[in-house]
């Protein structure tokens, strides 16, 4: 199929090359032989009058022209996929859809395992690829490379639609034997203690509690940085350090780790967990179904109010 002299199939090949950055992987992803992909590259070069790609060792290097074309081509293909092709009725029981979702280790533990259990019952062919927080999640959404982000809403852009899941309360935690946590924790003692904090991605982006503290003008003495919330409670054991984590996570680990949960002396720290999806997925039947599952399971979690009854363990 040609449009103004361009074989539209070549756009699919160009998108695969820009996504995979490998001729072999790109050819495999769109079911082309390597000779057929090499032919497509030659035709793309001829049409656009640009080299587009060159090999440097085993790495595929793209030209500025290829980089400029990539977003428009990706957007066009996604628009076709979700506005024209995906209008078939979605049957969860028969679907083999794989959802790619970016979320934290903590949300996987306290929330998403319930989603997995439910989907296994209602749609046994549906699968998930859960990904750690990325340095540029908005770009992955725009390119349709992930189906959902599950993040604190303060970290979400206004470009794509989102929905609230539930609110989170933050608490201070330390080892059960940490005598500095006995009685009321003063602001001075809190700020003098060594802290454990989570940071994410190659850029070591701050976690939500660190962002909230900085917004309030507080800077802690961080002595240990870990790549996820779930590592914090075990690494507090046997130390005098303290950390701020979501209450749901603290309650989860307090069942198996000698953990003391205390009220922190700072202004009430809380945030909202939300789910975000690409704007082009708004009317995609599979995405709609998955969003309903996420919101329904979030409502079940939010129903029992978090209380301070466990504080001061």
Curated annotation (Swiss-Prot):
What family does the database annotate? Answer: Belongs to the LysR transcriptional regulatory family.
| Gene Ontology molecular function terms on file | DNA binding; DNA-binding transcription factor activity
What does the miscellaneous comment read?
A: There are at least three nodD genes in R.meliloti. They differ in their specificity of interaction with different flavonoids and, consequently, contribute to the nodulation of various plant host species to different extents.
The record ties this protein, via InterPro entries, to:
LysR-type_TF, NodD_PBP2, Tscrpt_reg_HTH_LysR, WH-like_DNA-bd_sf, WH_DNA-bd_sf
Matching entries from Pfam families are given as: HTH_1
Per the entry, what this protein does is: NodD regulates the expression of the nodABCFE genes which encode other nodulation proteins. NodD is also a negative regulator of its own expression. Binds flavonoids as inducers.
* Biological source species: Rhizobium meliloti (strain 1021)
Keywords, comma-separated and alphabetical: Activator, DNA-binding, Nodulation, Plasmid, Repressor, Transcription, Transcription regulation
Q: Any idea which residues the entry calls the DNA-binding region? A: 23-42
Protein name per UniProt:
Nodulation protein D 3
HTH lysR-type domain sequence ranges: 6-63
